[in-house]
Amino acid sequence: MLDKVKHIILVLSGKGGVGKSTVSTQLALTLAEADHKVGLLDIDLCGPSVPYLLGLEDRDVHQCDEGWVPVYTSAEKRLAVMSIGFLLKNRSDAVIWRGPKKTAMIKQFLEDVNWDELDYLIIDTPPGTSDEHITVMECLKTVRTEGAIIVTTPQEMALEDVRKEVTFCKKTGIPILGIVENMSGFVCPNCSECTNIFSSGGGHSLAELAKVPHLGTLPIDPRVGELAGTGKACVKELPDCTTSEVLRELVRTLTTVGQ
């Protein structure tokens, strides 16, 4: 039920472990902090981490006549969340499904969740390019999709996978809103100095090569990592850190694109 959603944004990554779900959740929280009504759909069936990141693992989804009712992060209902993680008894439970069953579940997530009026729906996708991604693209053909944000890290292997992701988006007709480079340097929790651990500037160079916007560079910040599992917005808890600055600028960019 996407007819009540104004803007749909996909968050993609070429490989796992680049912080895609963290970017998705903090982006959703930042939009909600800016008084937007937001939905966050986690379709990473084999590795659903959104319920954990938002501190919602003990919550259940319910069904009504109109479909599944998403989980809300607060009484204000500014952020609604749906994930297969809510349907599993334990976080360690494995989803061992073949392609057709995964496809059916993703279609159900996209068509049968009873979202309220939403300004933004953020879709956190699995890493790579697979059946799940093709299903999402097919289901979104009939609705307006703002585009995709691609998350990468500075390592050459991650950048190589992002090149494939860029090609996938172009072939499937999904606009690329830009590239976010995550884990670029380590911020010392004592002096706040940022030290490069991997190579630097890869995300920016790749954005130039692919002729898409570079949306920001996020460092490894232990203070931000401590927010995992709390459901707290980085922009509210750590307003002066680099990650918050990048997230606020990202939201400004997205809201400008959506106008």
From Swiss-Prot:
GO molecular function terms noted in the UniProt entry: 4 iron, 4 sulfur cluster binding; ATP binding; ATP-dependent FeS chaperone activity; iron-sulfur cluster binding; metal ion binding
Subcellular location: Cytoplasm
Alphabetically ordered keywords of this record: 4Fe-4S, ATP-binding, Cytoplasm, Iron, Iron-sulfur, Metal-binding, Nucleotide-binding
Cofactor info, note text: Binds 4 [4Fe-4S] clusters per heterotetramer. Contains two stable clusters in the N-termini of Nubp1 and two labile, bridging clusters between subunits of the Nubp1-Nubp2 heterotetramer.
Pfam families: ParA
Sites where the protein binds ATP: G14, K15, G16, G17, V18, G19, K20, S21
UniProt superkingdom: Eukaryota
Any one GO biological process: iron-sulfur cluster assembly
Function according to Swiss-Prot or TrEMBL: Component of the cytosolic iron-sulfur (Fe/S) protein assembly (CIA) machinery. Required for maturation of extramitochondrial Fe-S proteins. The Nubp1-Nubp2 heterotetramer forms a Fe-S scaffold complex, mediating the de novo assembly of an Fe-S cluster and its transfer to target apoproteins.
Similarity section: Belongs to the Mrp/NBP35 ATP-binding proteins family. NUBP2/CFD1 subfamily.
Assembly behavior: Heterotetramer of 2 Nubp1 and 2 Nubp2 chains.
Annotated protein name in UniProt: Cytosolic Fe-S cluster assembly factor Nubp2 homolog
Organism name: Anopheles gambiae (African malaria mosquito)
